[in-house]
Amino acid sequence: MAACYNAYSAGSQSFEFDEDDDDASFDSGYEKSFETEAQLSSRRRLDFGTPPTPAIPQPYSGGTWDAVPLSSPPAGFVGLLDTSSNHSTRSGRTLVEHLNSRATNGVFDPPLTSTPVKSPEDPNAPRPKRKYAVGKNRVTRSRSPTQVVKIKRFRRMKANDRERNRMHNLNDALEKLRVTLPSLPEETKLTKIEILRFAHNYIFALEQVLESGGSINLDLEKLQNFTLSGERITKELFDALFVNPQPYPLFGRMFPYGQGMAPLAQHQTAPASHAEQPPAMGGFQHGMDYPQQPPGFDFTGSMRFYHQQQQQPHQPHHLQPNPQQESSPQQFSQEKYDLFRGSFDAAANLHSTNLDSGIHQQSSFYSQTPPWKDYPEDQAHVHPVPHQHSYKNFAPQV
């Protein structure tokens, strides 16, 4: 009978075991932990009285463990089994210390092992790309509608912040560019697209000035006005604006570009080089003072003058234009001026009744159109009787 003491119980409890039972042991179980699967013999009762039998060491042939009989453990392993000491003599030592003290000095290095060994990787080998599920194959966690709304709101807030920062940066850059560009006058307000166009035209104009060696006088106000018109400057336009300014027609007269309707100075100095002189146009005369406001076209006055000329086919000889004066466009004809001046004054003094009575009597409308006939109003609505053979009479449908 073996007694087991329980220190946590109030009184001692006794358990009875069969002495013939091989599973029973008189030790504390500490020695049982040193037994391995190599001892396949039936359980035996520990006898601490007899000394242990020394094991015969068998050399390891370098093969597998199958060559060694299963009845005895491998060489050097028997020393780990301590059957001569009990628990009381080794209570202060740990299991690790006991194994280290009883193990042999030999190194266990079998040629074959079941532990996989990772082969060294080639640093130059391309690393395989990770494959992520994209599109329909992507599996996401199921979210509640509240979570979906919160996620969308958060994404929209982040997108709005990014757009706001982008617009702030763009406006700051455009403001710095506007301050750098010359503006005439200084309080001129330019839009964003006008700032960009003016920057392009200004840089292009400076490039052309550098290529010409600084001989071109760049008019910034003219360049700014050209930019505000919405045009993009090119090489040809730059030459027409600053290198060779061309005159433009205005009310039938030719004025040089950039001077508007101001009169030309008679003492204007000639340019240094003949190549830069603009070509002379047909109706423009150098050295003449043109009026500030060119004469407009009076349609009523021109019709009165035409009617007066029709009524006076034979003019005096001194009022007829001289063909020699017409052949020379560079000379001013005083007779032409007097002719038109007197004609307009005479037409203005005519009575309106006399003017309206015969203004178009000589036209083909009055000479080729038959006279009008007055028809009575009662006969205007009479329906004409159709010819008897022209239409077929049908019976009235009820």
UniProtKB/Swiss-Prot annotation:
Region (Disordered): 35-59, 102-144, 265-333, 361-398
Bias (Polar residues) ranges: 361-370
Signal peptide: none
Subcellular location(s) per record: Nucleus
Positions with biased composition (Basic residues): 127-141
Statement: the UniProt record of this protein carries the keyword Transcription regulation: yes
Protein name listed in UniProt: Basic helix-loop-helix neural transcription factor TAP
Gene source species: Drosophila melanogaster
Gene: tap
